[in-house]
A protein has these predicted regions:
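Aromatic-anchored segments of alpha-helical transmembrane domains
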Residues: 20-21, 89-96, 159-171, 216-223, ...
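Membrane-interface loops
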Residues: 27-45, 70-165, 190, 320, ...
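PTP/DSP superfamily signal
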Residues: 197-282, 289, 311, 358-369, ...
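Membrane-embedded catalytic cores of phosphoryl/pyrophosphoryl-handling enzymes
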Residues: 118-206, 390-393, 399-409
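N-terminal transmembrane-helix/juxtamembrane module of multi-pass inner/ER membrane proteins
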Residues: 1-63, 106-108, 117, 249-262, ...
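Cysteine-based protein phosphatase catalytic domain of the PTP/DSP
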Residues: 113-120, 282-372, 376, 387-430
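Structural signal for the C-terminal ends of transmembrane alpha-helices
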Residues: 67-75, 144-149, 189-197, 224-226, ...
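Membrane-interface helix-boundary motifs at transmembrane edges
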Residues: 3-7, 69-81, 147-152, 199-204, ...
Length: 436
């Protein structure tokens, strides 16, 4: 639904008022305190002061006011407004809970540039530092202006928003950690507020969820005890907490995987957990072959690099069934017939998903070779291929499925929940046969 001008104008005015109110109130409250510290690196004293950079610094106001008018749908406008609102409120809370001020004296500047500095510094104070709300907002704005421009205009837009980011340092408005915090805040807001959120089915595994939750709680205790630089542990702590929620029932949708790829906001938000998954893949890939043939036209294997995927395509793979939620698919595989049914690691597919997997494998194996994979090519892949073997009649029982899979892929590990799902499917297939 197109955005009415009045709606865009209301959003622009409302967001501007929210920013001015929260930012100004936090500045004023902090100015009344005597316990305001600083946070910076020693080498930041050598960052030059560049007066002309006040122009890109102040230009963000114009882009901010104009952004809602670029939105082409109510959903896009609502998502933008939610991100900006959340960033302002979260940043405001941080300004009050962890007040900081700029550590250095800001040089006096003459001429018309000096007049600009005098004007905006008359309304500003050296507080509201971490996270940099200026950085968070320019990240939202940069994304929306890039979406609605192209060619040389987009290049100019991206360049200007890069200058806005740099200007926060070169005008002595922020320290380096403020910028890191601002980008982090923007990443969390991008991750949390999506235009299209899909609820994916999940079979919960509370035991794994508790492991992640315990890890998050341990990090929280460390942060509360040691403070200061231990706040950096918020990153893995939040990551563990979100993944714990996935295993308790939120499901694989936490990875936001779309068209076979994880967005950058997921890489940031869940980075520590994704790093753990990557290290796990590197370890297990030494324990097994890349892929094995289970039946004519059906291969089972692990997540492949783009080079390995290209080799598989040259070897005859024409379709891919990707069961991972936590990895981006290789470009070579996304270029052929690609289907993603995201299943959380260490969980089993639902019965509906097993039927969907079996149907895809059956259809694609008649046209060429279908490559079925999860992270390592073990339990999730075994469930998918097992569903196909049972549904097609190539195996008469779950025990036959297990025997065949272990014969062709000796290192395979099939988790109890995957076996239980296959047994449930087998019962349903038998009942369907008897009733027909």
């Amino acid at each position: 639904m197109p955005v009415k001008f009045s709606r865009a104008a209301l959003a622009s005015a409302g967001l501007s008022a929210l920013f001015l109110g929260v930012y100004g109130a936090c500045n004023w409250i902090t100015s009344l305190r005597s316990d305001v510290g600083t946070l910076y690196f020693w080498w930041e004293r050598y960052i030059p002061f560049v007066p002309i950079m006040v122009i890109p610094y102040l230009s963000i106001d114009l882009f901010f006011v104009g952004a809602p008018f670029l939105c082409r749908s109510e959903k896009e406008l609502a998502t933008f407004a939610k991100r900006v609102t959340a960033a302002i409120l979260v940043a405001g809370g941080c300004f009050l809970l962890f007040p900081l001020r700029f550590a250095f004296a800001r040089p006096h500047t003459g001429g018309w540039i000096g007049a600009l500095f005098d004007w905006f510094r008359g309304m500003d104070m050296p507080y509201n530092m971490l996270p940099s709300l200026h950085i968070a907002l320019r990240t939202f704005l940069g994304a929306i202006y890039a979406r609605h421009t192209s060619g040389i205009v987009r290049l100019a837009s991206n360049t200007w928003f890069s200058l806005i980011a740099i200007s926060t340092l070169l005008t002595y408005q922020h320290h380096t950690m403020d910028l890191v915090g601002g980008f982090a805040l923007a990443g969390y807001c991008f991750y949390t507020f999506q235009e299209n959120r899909i609820r994916l089915p999940v079979i919960a595994n509370r035991r794994i969820g508790f492991y992640y939750l315990i890890g998050a709680l341990i990090l929280a205790v460390i942060i509360l005890v040691f403070r200061r630089w231990s706040y950096l542990l918020l990153w893995p702590g939040i990551s563990f907490g979100i993944v714990a929620g996935a295993y308790f029932g939120a499901g694989p949708g936490i990875f936001r995987k779309t068209d076979g790829q994880l967005p950058w906001s997921t890489w940031w938000t869940l980075g520590p957990c994704l790093l753990g998954q990557r290290l796990s893949l590197l370890y297990y890939r030494l324990q097994c072959r890349p892929w094995d043939e289970v039946a004519p036209g059906v291969w089972i294997g692990r997540t492949l690099s783009n080079r390995e995927a290209s080799s598989a395509v040259r070897a005859g793979v024409t379709a891919v069934l990707d069961l991972t939620a936590e990895f981006s698919e290789a470009k070579a595989f996304r270029a052929i017939s690609y289907h993603n049914i995201p299943i959380l690691d260490l969980t089993a597919p639902s019965q509906e998903q097993l039927r969907e997997m079996a149907a895809f494998i059956s259809e694609q194996s008649e046209k060429g070779i279908v490559y079925v994979h999860c992270k390592i090519g073990y339990s999730r892949s075994a469930a998918a291929v097992g569903a196909y073997l049972l549904a097609s009649g190539k195996c008469g029982s779950v025990e036959d499925v297990v025997a065949l899979l272990r014969q062709v892929r000796p290192s395979i590990i099939i988790r109890p929940e995957a076996l239980a799902a296959l047994r449930h499917l087998k019962v349903a297939l038998v009942q369907k046969t008897l009733s027909s």
